[in-house]
């Protein structure tokens, strides 16, 4: 049997079981725990490669062939770190494992048959993960969307109305009209987009109107006054409509200290921004919120972990 060196194998098919990959410019190292391929039966598209009629491409007329296959991808998800082919059918993942031609290759899954209608996407040397969710977006410009997609982000949650002072500061799309216009503008983009309404009000109708207009929740921001009253009202309406609330707490402590904010939250679930304190809020006391079971703490650009 002809053999190639490990270096040549990685160059052709990407890393395999036991290989370690550094993640970007971080100090994090990912080790591949399992490779679903059958060595010697790998599929690959291109000149002199295997995705050809009768080879890795099935000629059987009755098989349920894939619409697309991502070949030899390194996958990182909640189940582990592994190497596999990813089959796509009708716009959804049909299977993960060994893809190819069941008539000529060993180990090919029933739902991973490559046929004449299958598009090939090269995954060699690339990492595949679930789409990232960015939960803190100031919607200033449409150019943010392609930049996020290039980074693997497929869901963006935040607020704003474009390059306005309120947008730069608060991640809020305030009011029924602004929310509807942002949703209308979002229709043309291949990105999952969600918009926060303005939670800084004690006006129950104003809160409800924003949810009915399409807001996925409320943002309470200190620039509009993160007082105990508006925290309580926004959480009341959020519970009624089963939506979320995010908060940027009060840096100046003019509406109360961190203890007053936690009392207004009252054990209800809330997403606290800048919980490390570097980006604002009850700095540095807001870090106390990270110890509360009902609070989802978050950090943003002022604190970037896993880098030098």
Swiss-Prot record:
Residue stretches making up the Urease domain: 131-308
Give residue numbers for the modification (N6-carboxylysine). 219
Q: Which cofactor does it need?
A: Ni cation
Q: Which residues bind Ni(2+) 1?
A: 219, 248, 274
What's a single GO BP term from this record?
A: urea catabolic process
Task: Write down the Pfam families for this protein, in alphabetical order.
Answer: Amidohydro_1, Urease_alpha
- Its domain of life reads Bacteria
Describe its PTM?
A: Carboxylation allows a single lysine to coordinate two nickel ions.
Alphabetized UniProt keyword annotations: Cytoplasm, Hydrolase, Metal-binding, Nickel
EC number(s) on file: 3.5.1.5
Subcellular location(s) per record: Cytoplasm
Residues that, per the record, bind Ni(2+) 2: 136, 138, 219
Among InterPro entries, the record links this protein to:
Amidohydro-rel, Metal-dep_hydrolase_composite, Metal_Hydrolase, Urease_alpha_N_dom, Urease_alpha_subunit, Urease_asu_c, Urease_Ni-bd
Q: What class of enzyme is it?
A: hydrolase
Query: What does the subunit section of this Swiss-Prot or TrEMBL entry state?
Result: Heterohexamer of 3 UreA (alpha) and 3 UreB (beta) subunits.
Q: Which NCBIfam families match?
A: PRK13207.1
**What family does the Swiss-Prot or TrEMBL record give for this protein?**
Belongs to the metallo-dependent hydrolases superfamily. Urease alpha subunit family.
Full protein name: Urease subunit beta
Q: Which organism is it from?
A: Helicobacter mustelae
The organism's lineage is: Bacteria, Pseudomonadati, Campylobacterota, Epsilonproteobacteria, Campylobacterales
Q: What gene is this protein translated from?
A: ureB
């Amino acid at each position: 049997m002809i053999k190639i060196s490990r270096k040549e194998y990685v160059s052709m098919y990407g890393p395999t079981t036991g290989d370690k990959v550094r993640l970007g410019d971080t100090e994090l190292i990912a080790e591949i725990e399992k490779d679903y391929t059958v060595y010697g039966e790998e599929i690959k598209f291109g000149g002199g490669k295997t995705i050809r009629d009768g080879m890795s491409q099935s000629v059987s007329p009755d098989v349920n062939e894939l619409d697309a296959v991502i070949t030899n991808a390194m996958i990182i998800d909640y189940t582990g770190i592994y190497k596999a082919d990813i089959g796509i059918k009708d716009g959804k993942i049909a299977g993960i494992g060994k893809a190819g031609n069941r008539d000529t290759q060993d180990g090919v899954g029933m739902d991973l048959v490559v046929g004449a209608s299958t598009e090939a996407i090269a995954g060699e040397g690339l990492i595949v993960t679930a789409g990232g969710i960015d939960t803190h977006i100031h919607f200033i410009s449409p150019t943010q969307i392609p930049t996020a997609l290039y980074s693997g982000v497929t869901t963006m949650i935040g607020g704003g109305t474009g390059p306005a002072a309120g947008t730069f500061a608060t991640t809020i799309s305030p009011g029924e009209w602004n929310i509807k216009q942002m949703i209308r503008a979002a229709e043309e983009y291949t990105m999952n987009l969600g918009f926060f309404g303005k939670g800084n009000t004690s006006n129950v109708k104003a809160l409800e109107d924003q949810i009915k207009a399409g807001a996925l929740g409320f943002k309470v921001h200190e620039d509009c006054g993160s007082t105990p009253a508006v925290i309580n009202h926004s959480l009341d309406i959020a519970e009624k409509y089963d939506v979320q609330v995010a908060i940027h707490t009060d840096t100046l402590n003019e509406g109360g200290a961190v203890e007053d904010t936690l009392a207004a939250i009252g054990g209800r679930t809330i997403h606290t921004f800048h919980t490390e304190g570097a980006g604002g809020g009850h700095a540095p006391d807001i870090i106390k919120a990270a110890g509360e079971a009902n609070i989802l703490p978050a950090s943003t650009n002022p604190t970037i972990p896993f880098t030098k």
